[in-house]
């Protein structure tokens, strides 16, 4: 779905990965990150967010919590990072990244609370008084932690398993109780998703969750609370920032916006350019169909099922001219291989380049950040696993 836009807007990335793979510098089963384009995307998002009075906290899980990317994104103007869980927080902290937001979507387990406190996140979201008390109990004397309340109202939208929080109608009482806990300072509100892609209009629209947190903010202001942070994640990129800022949002958390892989980026030219591909290799044939190594063939299902195609070849021009449909294993199966439709142009050892919306952290793929693509001098900045740890590839 994203391959067409990748070829139109960043064909240099395809050229680079084919050459690097054929030169044995990057492995099969690898997400390749175009660092130059990611930096460009983050700069424009940071500039727009700051212009609109908002903080920019990018999400890094979908690019494998990669430490090289963390450092590049922070230098490009991000105010910190949202950490979806403690695994995110550890990798980002180790890479020298500032933790802007923790506890949303995944709350911090009790045994890890002290470790999280030591990382000093700027904001920490809680779903209950019990989780707030765990933070309060773990705080050293004199350390203040700003906490956000995850809230919900009837009719709000959630992915299955993401539900939870405080009832929105109780928000004034919630804020007062959180403020009263030793070391805690009530700072604001969070929900997810506050935006989703609408297939009918092919645009991003706010969910009811968005109105829930904005109405709760009004109640808090009527009760005398000021400087209320509003965290509004979900399908976020710079084209939404002006309206969100005017509505009162103070924190945005682009993930796929950073790599140009939100649903709208697949359909039209947005400010952010594509900056990520999945690379594999043809390894064998069976009944005239080519098989390519899997491991990272998880496609985040933001669209209904669609025909998946890839560029295949041993040099860039050949690969860009040889676009072949590939059958990806069902998510219920282990993706040992992708199976291509019959095409006489495909050869064993050919590079395979896919363009799809990835979630590297749920796969067993490598993650390879590459600098210098924009200048025509691509350089591999290391080969990492999908949890952000550097590997010794091709050795152990």
Each predicted region: which residue ranges?
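Active-site loop/helix belt of alpha/beta enzymes
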Residues: 153-270
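N-terminal capping/small domains of soluble enzymes
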Residues: 20-51, 55-57, 62-75, 84-91, ...
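Active-site-proximal beta-alpha core segment in soluble small-molecule metabolic enzymes
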Residues: 55-198
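Active-site loop ensemble at the mouth of alpha/beta enzyme cores that anchors a bound cofactor
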Residues: 238-316
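C-terminal accessory subdomain/extension
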Residues: 289-396
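Generic N-terminal amphipathic, Lys/Arg-enriched alpha-helix
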Residues: 1-8, 12-33
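Glycine-rich tight-turn/loop motif centered on a GG-T
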Residues: 22-34, 118-124, 158-165, 200-208
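Alpha-helix-loop-beta-strand connector modules within alpha/beta enzyme cores
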Residues: 42-52, 101-106, 174, 209-223
